Amino acid sequence: MTIFDNYEVWFVIGSQHLYGPEALRQVTKHAEHVVNSLNAEAKLPCKLVLKPLGTTPDEITHICRDANYDDKCAGLVVWLHTFSPAKMWINGLTILNKPLLQFHTQYNAALPWDSIDMDFMNLNQTAHGGREFGFIGARMRQQHSVVTGHWQDKEAHQRIGGWMRQAVSKQDTRHLKVCRFGDNMREVAVTDGDKVAAQIKFGFSVNTWAVGDLVQVVNSISDGDISALVDEYESSYRLTPAAQVHGDKRQNVLDAARIELGMKRFLEQGGFHAFTTTFEDLHGLKQLPGLAVQRLMQQGYGFAGEGDWKTAALLRIMKVMSTGLQGGTSFMEDYTYHFDNGNDLVLGSHMLEVCPTIATAEKPILDVQPLGIGGKADPARLIFNTQTGPAIVASLIDLGDRFRLLVNTIETVPTPHDLPKLPVANALWKAQPDLRTASEAWIIAGGAHHTVFSHALNLDDMRQFAELHDIELTVIDNDTRLPSFKDALRWNEVYYGSKR
């Protein structure tokens, strides 16, 4: 069972009574066939639920109102089977607060050249009925998603499925609670921001809990529960001699297990699905949570270090979007560079907290090593290399008057040499279009040093996310050129300034 099983998407057919009851019966029959086929064959993440035809303003308003108040409804897919005068949709669209996708399709794929007549033409009017619907969306300044293609087309299925992921993610985000254990890393700017503005824009709430509250729960964990979790560690990872039974760091592994169980219990009791820590606020904890954070991210929790609540929330959002897709999604940080005459690389990592969902198939190593900051005992952590292939890194920043999402497309590459003295998980990548352009553009646009790294999602996913939440998107990819990139930032400043 996944988060998508908690939601459904309503399939709404737009028509009118102009064409008579027989035409509406055929429309209904077509709609039933399409919905049943999509549910059975399209591999959509959510179930489609067919709703009654929308043929009058009152019917349409009723459907939209019901969608707003149904917690299971993640959004609406609308198909304009016949012509549906768009003034009928104004009241409904005015009150609708769920994501909307217009499926610009028709029942038949090919025209019946020998038999086509005006009855057929009146029944199958997506081509211009869809344009009428598009106009009212533009007139109302309500941007919605559009997918064009026959309902049996696999590309259309994939695009609808991708939109469904966004719709469910948006509903989940409205209920998302982010727990900050302690505050920001002192004097750091980009990890701070306006939590009230974020809750208004995205729906997630951010609040702080004292580390002492967490410590109370951590200390209440039983030895039996710790032993059972360590058994799981033994079967899931390759433990170094120091971490094994009778190893000189075995107690550190037991302490890490206690922290993991305590953190998970605290998060579950509070209904949190994202959290932050900071190495400057660990009073009462024996070590900086490393292994615990890695495993909680693997279970779907959002996380970021140093109190970075925006990245923690973004990680949770992107994990929901990517549920069930190939590839992983993790907290990440651009750590250091490898300059090599145009073959420049970025080594990404963090102090400890990289999610195992992005690891290669090889079992991660569980090790205990010193950590030079935090002033605590040596923390346990998982060490691994990352899968190779196309990926993205994304950063959400607060510019004061708006939120900006930065996305850089990258290519993850194999590590050319062993890293015997680097005791943390890491990823090595080529930034697109090249490191010079990508880093300069990122810096000019104010991108954070913390990011969300994902093999599972792509630029189109993040573009749709930005559109759904009406936030600025700044893209750095193979098409990026710095002069035009700077121009776009200036234009965005004017555009978003006009919306204040």
UniProtKB/Swiss-Prot annotation:
Protein name, as recorded: L-arabinose isomerase
Pfam families, per the entry: AraA_central, AraA_N, Arabinose_Iso_C
Record GO cellular component, one term: cytosol
Name of the encoding gene: araA
Details of cofactor binding: Binds 1 Mn(2+) ion per subunit.
Keyword Cell division tagged: no
Gene source species: Klebsiella pneumoniae subsp. pneumoniae (strain ATCC 700721 / MGH 78578)
Record family assignment: Belongs to the arabinose isomerase family.
HAMAP family assigned to the protein according to its UniProt record, in alphabetical order: Arabinose_Isome
GO molecular function ontology, one term from the record: manganese ion binding
Enzyme class: isomerase
UniProt-listed InterPro entries: Ara_Isoase_C, AraA_central, AraA_N, AraA_N_sf, Fuc/Ara_isomerase_C, Fucose_isomerase_N/cen_sf, Lara_isomerase
Any one of the GO BP annotations: L-arabinose catabolic process to xylulose 5-phosphate
Keywords annotated in UniProt: Arabinose catabolism, Carbohydrate metabolism, Isomerase, Manganese, Metal-binding
Functional pathway: Carbohydrate degradation; L-arabinose degradation via L-ribulose; D-xylulose 5-phosphate from L-arabinose (bacterial route): step 1/3
Cofactor dependency: Mn(2+)
Protein purpose: Catalyzes the conversion of L-arabinose to L-ribulose.
EC number: 5.3.1.4
Reaction equations catalysed: beta-L-arabinopyranose = L-ribulose
UniProt xrefs under CDD domains: L-arabinose_isomerase
Subunit structure: Homohexamer.
Residues that bind Mn(2+): 306, 333, 350, 450
